[in-house]
């Protein structure tokens, strides 16, 4: 009976953590996600951080490249918004203000902040080489924004934080020894870190998937994604994988993209 009571308390605590927040579904993939952070909260925070970043960043002096980034970005954003509106999901990005900026930074990278603020480093362009490959990158970044990955990661951080506290409190209330409580807390800490990194890899894969579809929707040939990521693999340093890595391995990423290609081509051929 005592064991049953302990199990009930732990289960109730777990349900308390996952039962709050807003449940939504990610566009394209349909994956269910539970968000504890509202759009208003995260857009307010990220908007200020983006403003501070752009005040310090140096915009690219290459007018042609800057125009290309903005042109490809807006073409993608238009296609994405049209798709969301057609599927009754327009409210998900109603407060987004899409912005695409090229800055001087020789790193091979780009990043997205919530609300549609996307920054491309000019060091990425020698690897993208053409507009279609750039669309693959921007589609990936737009996917992070549309899928609300930042809000999801913040929500998961909250769950982990309170989960650690609840575990100790529940275990003590259930009569578990302090040694076992510490052991359980330590185990959850390791597990939480591994799960968080694994979830990040999952988000990156999801952004690859959604971004590929978005690029095809905008009329860019999604097949360029394979050769682009092969160039990215060659440009990156070190090819090893790790359980705590934030991104899928290059080989896994390319294999996944090839698996999604038939779906993407349906959108591309429909143009």
Residue ranges: model-predicted function:
Residues 3-9, 20-271:
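A Zn2+-metalloprotease active-site environment signal
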């Amino acid at each position: 009976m005592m064991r049953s009571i302990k199990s009930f308390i732990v289960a109730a605590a777990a349900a308390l953590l996952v039962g709050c927040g807003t449940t939504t579904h990610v566009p394209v993939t349909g994956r269910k996600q539970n968000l504890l952070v509202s759009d208003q909260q995260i857009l307010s925070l990220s908007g200020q951080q983006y403003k501070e970043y752009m005040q310090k960043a140096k915009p690219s002096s290459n007018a042609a490249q800057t125009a290309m980034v903005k042109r490809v970005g807006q073409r993608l954003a238009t296609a994405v918004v049209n798709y969301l509106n057609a599927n009754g999901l327009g409210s998900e990005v109603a407060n987004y203000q899409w912005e695409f900026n090229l800055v001087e930074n020789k790193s091979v990278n780009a990043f997205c902040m919530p609300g549609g603020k996307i920054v491309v480093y000019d060091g990425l362009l020698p690897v993208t080489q053409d507009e279609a490959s750039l669309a693959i990158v921007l589609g990936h970044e737009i996917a992070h924004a549309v899928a609300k990955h930042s809000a999801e990661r913040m929500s998961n951080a909250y769950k982990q934080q309170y989960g650690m506290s609840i575990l100790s409190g529940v275990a003590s209330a259930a009569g578990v020894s302090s040694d076992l409580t510490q052991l359980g807390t330590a185990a959850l800490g390791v597990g939480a870190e591994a799960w968080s990194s694994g979830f990040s890899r999952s988000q990156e894969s999801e952004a690859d998937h959604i971004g590929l579809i978005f690029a095809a929707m905008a009329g860019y040939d999604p097949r360029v994604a394979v050769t682009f990521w092969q160039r990215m693999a060659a440009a990156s340093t070190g090819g090893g994988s790790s359980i705590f890595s934030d991104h899928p391995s290059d080989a896994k990423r390319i294999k996944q993209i090839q698996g999604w290609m038939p779906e993407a081509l349906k959108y591309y051929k429909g143009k």
